[in-house]
Amino acid sequence: MTKKQRYNKELLLEIAKKIKQLREKKNISQDVFYIETDIHIARIETGKLNIRITTLQDICDYFEISLSEFFKDM
């Protein structure tokens, strides 16, 4: 694995962790999240899916935060 690949994987895992924290803070299950957003979040939350920026924007909209707020502490 190259340095860039490691960095990309670490970034995906940080994004995944943040999404899961947001969801758990609102006490929302993955199933409820899917029903309300039509976004399958399980693979995103494990870092196994390279999330598109548009999907991340949809997730941020759902949690009523901006993309800049999402990345603020990362």
Predicted regions and their residues:
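The alpha-helix within a helix-turn-helix
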Residues: R23, Y34, C60
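Short C-terminal boundary/hinge segments that cap the last helix of small helical domains
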Residues: E64-M74
